[in-house]
């Protein structure tokens, strides 16, 4: 593994059109799981100028059964979508939460998919699809996330909080960030470049107002990155194309699942290709990605490695994973195959079956709306939210590998 290099990650804000789509899709997941913890949901969202479209497949007791919606269900779906967009802050001529056109094209789940996934008789619940899923952790930040992505997220979270509070009234919802760090000995030692492109109010692309916006962004960056990473050698690119008044879904169409690297590890780890948002936790694209992060984080938190990548693989309709792979990138204190064996010996994980994962992490709950902006990983485990960020396997792993 190289020890001296430059590495870059990007993030996008809650107002980015693809993230608007992700948040709507996950708000729908939460809505259905609040009605039926065993609901099946695959909800895709399209956002564009004054239009939101939902498409996908569902099954939910008391909401959609036998090919028909329960009374009031479609109205509740539309209300949920509009409230989600309102919370983000879109009240623009080209995209306004009160006035955009809305289309609901959700329909029933395929019976052929259901028969392969549902538990029946002596058959355990199978995986909702085939696929490979990866989890990762490293010791670059306190949350055991890649530093470049961690700081990219934090810049945008700070700006969004200031926009919502009124502290930065010139900001609009659509924003992107990018952080380049120099690493020495595998540790971040300097920020070489910071990129922030933010939608703004009228007039903030010239003169004193432009200077005010750029000074504000630099202040945010200084509050997020450690002081020893910043210097007069750090290059800033703030709205490098100039004006950015037209943004969000009015500037670019948004789709669910197009920010999978932002959602995960910022390019620092492999990705199996499956998006998370809009999917209930029987879909291993989501639940297995969460449990692999959980395992990787606990391995690093236990001091068993400085970096850890984990892969799981599944077949549709089959409950047991096809493979488990651990790679500590030469930083492990014990052999990788011994860590694999220790994981397989933890009974609480239920053999890493879809139901075992969901039961151990408590995933059959309406906890997904919060995941859909600023990353699914490196967040604080609070109450039912972000349970895959807990480090409650540390003692079990240490004991198994003593």
Swiss-Prot record:
GO MF annotation list: ATP binding; magnesium ion binding; methionine adenosyltransferase activity
Reported cofactor(s): Mg(2+); K(+)
Positions annotated to bind ATP: 16, 174-176, 252, 258-259, 275, 279
One GO BP annotation of this record: S-adenosylmethionine biosynthetic process
A single GO cellular-component term on record: cytoplasm
PROSITE patterns recorded: ADOMET_SYNTHASE_1 (PS00376), ADOMET_SYNTHASE_2 (PS00377)
Listed InterPro entries: ADOMET_SYNTHASE_CS, S-AdoMet_synt_C, S-AdoMet_synt_central, S-AdoMet_synt_N, S-AdoMet_synthetase, S-AdoMet_synthetase_sfam
Annotated positions binding K(+): 44
Main location: cytoplasm
Catalytic activity: L-methionine + ATP + H2O = S-adenosyl-L-methionine + phosphate + diphosphate
UniProt keyword annotations, A-Z: ATP-binding, Cytoplasm, Magnesium, Metal-binding, Nucleotide-binding, One-carbon metabolism, Potassium, Transferase
Binding site for L-methionine: 57, 109, 252, 283
EC number: 2.5.1.6
Class of enzymatic activity (EC top level): transferase
Function noted in UniProt: Catalyzes the formation of S-adenosylmethionine (AdoMet) from methionine and ATP. The overall synthetic reaction is composed of two sequential steps, AdoMet formation and the subsequent tripolyphosphate hydrolysis which occurs prior to release of AdoMet from the enzyme.
NCBIfam families listed in its UniProt record: metK
PANTHER family: S-ADENOSYLMETHIONINE SYNTHETASE
Record-stated family: Belongs to the AdoMet synthase family.
Protein name, UniProt field: S-adenosylmethionine synthase
Organism field: Rhizorhabdus wittichii (strain DSM 6014 / CCUG 31198 / JCM 15750 / NBRC 105917 / EY 4224 / RW1)
Taxonomic path: Bacteria, Pseudomonadati, Pseudomonadota, Alphaproteobacteria, Sphingomonadales
Name of the coding gene: metK
